[in-house]
Curated annotation (Swiss-Prot):
Annotated consequence of substituting residue 81 to A: Abolished binding to acetylated histone H3
Encoding gene (name): TAF14
Any one GO MF annotation of this record: RNA polymerase II general transcription initiation factor activity
Assembly with partners or alone: The 1.2 MDa TFIID complex is composed of TATA binding protein (TBP) and the 14 TBP-associated factors. One copy of each TAF1, TAF2, TAF3, TAF7, TAF8, TAF11, TAF13, two copies of each TAF4, TAF5, TAF6, TAF9, TAF10, TAF12, and three copies of TAF14. TFIIF is composed of three different subunits: TFG1/RAP74, TFG2/RAP30 and TAF14. Component of the SWI/SNF global transcription activator complex.
Gene Ontology biological process: chromatin remodeling; DNA repair; DNA-templated transcription; positive regulation of transcription by RNA polymerase II; regulation of DNA-templated transcription; regulation of transcription by RNA polymerase II; RNA polymerase II preinitiation complex assembly; transcription by RNA polymerase II
Annotated YEATS domain residues: 1-134
Coiled coil: none
Protein name according to UniProt: Transcription initiation factor TFIID subunit 14
C-alpha cells in the first residue's frame, strides 16, 4: 500500500455588495472570490504548491461554469446575486490524484474560512518535495475509523481481507441523488475506485455522518442518508464517471 500523509487546506471566501450595480429580483449583486491555501504544521498559511490545478464547478447558470486555475492561490472572482453549493476539484502534482471538495458559497458573512483535511500519497518525488515545505513527510499514523488504515498500511498493521464499500440506506431520494441508484453504483466500482470513495467520505466527514471503518473485516460502511447533499452529489458524479 502507498504511504500517505495528511495536510489541511483552507478555503477562503470573501464577498461584498456592488452598490453601483442594479439589484436582480430585488437581491443586491455581489462581488465574491474564493482562494485556496495550505496550512503548515504550525497552522500558518502557505501557498498550496502541492496542487497542479484547481477546478471550480460553478452553478450551471454561469458562462463556462467549470473554471480552471493553475497558480496559487487559485483565486476565482465572480459576480452574482445568490449563493449556491459547488464542488472544488483539487489535483495533486504528478497526477497523484484528484480530491473533490464540497463548498457552500453563501453571503452570511463578508469573509469566512473552511478547512478540510486530505490524505496525500508519498510515492511522487516532486509532490513529496513540496509537501516537505508544510511539515513532516513521515507516514501518517492511522486512527481507528479513518481511511489511514487502508492507505497507509505498514508492517505492524494487517492487510484487510478485502476492501468493500457497504451501504445502508432505504430506497429514497435525498436532494437530487437517488440513494438506491448510488448504492447500486458503488457495488460496480473496482477496488481502486472504492479507495477514492473512502477518501472522499473521510476527507469530508462530519459528526452527523454515520460511517464505520471495520478494519478487521476490510469493510467501510456508509449510511448514505446521513451524508450531506453536496457530498452525495460528488459521490454520484464519481460513480457515474467510473462506471460508464
Amino acid at each position: 500500500m502507498v504511504a500517505t500523509v495528511k495536510r489541511t487546506i483552507r478555503i477562503k471566501t470573501q464577498q461584498h455588495i456592488l452598490p453601483e450595480v442594479p439589484p436582480v429580483e430585488n437581491f443586491p449583486v455581489r462581488q465574491w472570490s474564493i482562494e485556496i491555501v495550505l496550512l503548515d504544521d504550525e497552522g500558518k498559511e502557505i501557498p498550496a504548491t502541492i496542487f497542479d490545478k484547481v477546478i471550480y464547478h460553478l452553478h450551471p447558470t454561469f458562462a463556462n461554469p467549470n473554471r480552471t486555475f493553475t497558480d496559487p492561490p487559485f483565486r476565482i472572482e465572480e459576480q452574482g446575486w445568490g449563493g449556491f453549493p459547488l464542488d472544488i476539484s483539487v489535483f495533486l502534482l504528478e497526477k497523484a490524484g484528484e480530491r473533490k471538495i464540497p463548498h457552500d458559497l453563501n453571503f452570511l458573512q463578508e469573509s469566512y474560512e473552511v478547512e478540510h483535511v486530505i490524505q496525500i500519497p508519498l510515492n511522487k518525488p516532486l509532490l513529496t518535495e513540496e509537501l516537505a515545505k508544510s511539515g513532516s513527510t513521515e507516514e501518517t499514523t492511522a486512527n481507528t475509523g479513518t481511511i489511514g488504515k487502508r492507505r497507509t498500511t505498514t508492517n505492524t498493521t494487517a492487510e484487510p481481507k478485502a476492501k468493500r464499500a457497504k451501504t445502508g440506506s432505504a430506497s429514497t431520494v435525498k436532494g437530487s441523488v437517488d440513494l438506491e441508484k448510488l448504492a447500486f453504483g458503488l457495488t460496480k466500482l473496482n477496488e481502486d475506485d472504492l479507495v477514492g470513495v473512502v477518501q472522499m467520505v473521510t476527507d469530508n466527514k462530519t459528526p452527523e455522518m454515520n460511517v464505520t471503518n471495520n478494519v478487521e473485516e476490510g469493510e467501510f460502511i456508509i449510511d448514505l442518508y446521513s451524508l450531506p447533499e453536496g457530498l452525495l452529489k460528488s459521490l454520484w458524479d464519481y460513480v457515474k464517471k467510473n462506471t460508464e
